[in-house]
Amino acid sequence: MPFSRLFGKKEKNQMDDIVEEGVQRVQELPMDKIFPNQFQPRTVFDQDKIDELARTIRIHGVIQPIVVREMEPDYYEIIAGERRFRAVLSLEMEKIPAIIQNLDDEEVAAIALIENLQREELTPIEEAKAYRSLLDMQDVTQEALAQRVGKSQSAIANKMRLLKLPETVQEAVLIKQISERHARSLLALETEEQQVALLAEIAENHWNVKQTEARIQEILGVKKQVATKKTKPKRQAISRDVRIAMNTIKQSVTMVKDNGMDLDFTEEETDDFYQITIQIPKKK
């Protein structure tokens, strides 16, 4: 199956073609010969949902087969359907219906991402890491990837910006201790130490996003005020001394001119000093 086909549809479930092409190859595979998808973007599974699915499977069986690929003789990797696999595993069933497909790593990674995006089950961090993985595997731009997964380029860029945060903050998003908007606001802080410290404040005070943003403005505002206080007195002192010196020189030049001497007076300001040039002609 060409890789481009996995990204070529937006309205129809991209998994449909796999099922249609492999429907004649449904097999009952031993559970102990199947292992999870190495490219599975989801790292946190809702156990309550798996238990609910297991109860349904206990009554009705596995209605939709999982999709796998054969990695070595009689050993299979899940391409799609890991929740079903986990539910069946919890029921201690020995076999599960599966469709065997011959797909490469890039196709498997793409399918895993698409399946989870369609169900909106990924956390923002999982989604961001999945995008990064696909970009690393494929020679494509964010814009091309956005078109292929039905997202805007800015949406993908914003998700991937979350990966600039410290691992501690990313983990907090992953376990839903803070929201994506909380995490995004932390990007305004300059250092990881500030971000981690504010994460602790958010958790301790149970701040919402608005309160978090207000606290960030306090932090940034205090830093700016401290910088201003440190430099302002020095600038004022220098300005006063320079002004006195400049006025004294100008008064002297004016006095000389008033006495009938023709001279040129120029001044130039650089980053480090004022330069004054006085030219007095040798001949009148």
Swiss-Prot record:
GO biological process per UniProt: chromosome segregation; division septum assembly; positive regulation of sporulation resulting in formation of a cellular spore
The encoding gene: noc
Localization, UniProt: Cytoplasm, Nucleoid
SUPFAM superfamilies named in the record: ParB/Sulfiredoxin
InterPro entries linked: Chromosome_partition/occlusion, HTH_ParB/Spo0J, Nucleoid_occlusion_protein, ParB/RepB/Spo0J, ParB/Sulfiredoxin_dom, ParB/Sulfiredoxin_sf
One Pfam short name: HTH_ParB
One Gene Ontology cellular component: chromosome
Family recorded in the similarity comment: Belongs to the ParB family.
Keyword line: Cell cycle, Cell division, Cytoplasm, DNA-binding, Septation
Spans traversing the lipid bilayer: none
NCBIfam families: nucleoid_noc, parB_part
CDD domains, per the entry: SPO0J_N
SMART domains for this protein: ParB (SM00470)
Molecular function terms from GO: DNA binding
Origin species: Listeria monocytogenes serovar 1/2a (strain ATCC BAA-679 / EGD-e)
Function recorded in the entry: Effects nucleoid occlusion by binding relatively nonspecifically to DNA and preventing the assembly of the division machinery in the vicinity of the nucleoid, especially under conditions that disturb the cell cycle. It helps to coordinate cell division and chromosome segregation by preventing the formation of the Z ring through the nucleoid, which would cause chromosome breakage.
Protein's recorded name: Nucleoid occlusion protein
Record feature DNA-binding region, as residue ranges: 143-162
The organism's place on the tree of life at top rank: Bacteria
